[in-house]
Amino acid sequence: MLKSGLPRCAALAAALVMAGGLQASAAEPGLSADSIRIGSFGALTGPGYLYGKLPMNGVEVVFDEINAAGGIHGRKLQLVREDDRCDAASAIAAIQKLVHQDQVFALIGGGCSNATFAAREAIETAKIPTLIFASVHDGITQPPAPNIYSAALTSSIESEAQVLFAQQQGAKRIAMISMRDAWGRARYQPLIEILKAKGITLVADEELSPDANDATAQVLRLKAANADAVIIVLYPKPAAVYIRDAQKLGFKPLNIGQSGIADPAAFEEQVGVPGATQSFRTISQVKYTPEDAAMDKWRKLVEAKFPGDRLSVYNLFGIGSAQVLIEALKRAGPDLTREKLQAAFATIKEFKTDVHPGPVTCSQSDHRCHKSPAWLAKEPGGPIRVLGVTTVEN
């Protein structure tokens, strides 16, 4: 009797252990034996949809591919979207809904920087693992919150890359034109500090409002300063106004953009003046253009799932970020918890996605995992070209 009881005791003990493991998993919000619910926040409507809806579409096609292959440790990924309308209050409300009502396990998102920055406290308080896919505000990841990582470039990394690019192109008289809202200041101040550290004095420092319809005065001052390179810290609309007026007034410096103007083809159309973007160069978070043959696979998947859409550089933001999230989920293992996923992000080193210009590396002390912006150019009427990559060491 004693011998026959031992196997039963062992079986009972094993069952209790398994039940305990299942209960632990079940206790995690958004997690079941066969699914992981991931929340995403960003603008689904209005002009900010470029940084919200389109990256989310990229995330979703990656999730579909993973799910078709069996999921992650047997769990399928589900994406729950919430519109933050590129607005601070709406972003906070979106986080609260995803965390408390939708009960998601983790977050991937963040489009408009001002909105995401406003939501940082809500994300940190919720202790939910979060990966940013587009927002660049330094304050989102610095100082590091334990649960927030970024697969996007940050404003200080882009700012340093802009200065390095100007120097690499031989510029001697560097100027700047910028917005001074929260988004603009997040880039402007790092630029000033970087220029100071390099011993560079701007020959002109101009401000242009986000809703400006004329930049004649700013262009005339930049031209009078004989600037040979102008660092642009503007949204696409005011940047287009500046470029149009520069062309009209015969001012043709090297114009250096950033990821807020990440689609040179769309920007050329927005400027609407033949030849005006001839000397415009801009930063991209990804190393390929949507037309590149290397993106054929993703083009087919995006355009099949979202009929009428064409593959966009903003879809690629989501694709690369989703691959980083999936790598972290794999590393966290089958006995998944939020704490394990959070810890897994910090172990990602030299990870190559299908779209990032350089390897993605995260650490406990630095949650800015992407530091290798690519440079794009587009000859008027011609294709977009990738000029190279600048890796920032900071």
Residue ranges and their predicted role:
Residues 89, 103-206, 255-278:
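Extracytoplasmic ligand/sensor domains, especially the bilobed periplasmic-binding protein
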Residues 1-37, 68, 391-394:
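Short, low-complexity disordered leader/linker segments with a strong preference
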Residues 304-315, 326-384:
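Segments of small-molecule ligand-sensing domains
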Residues 47, 51, 55-62, 91-95, ...:
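Stable alpha-helical elements in mature extracytoplasmic
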Residues 28-60, 82-89, 111, 177-185, ...:
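Extracytoplasmic "Venus flytrap"
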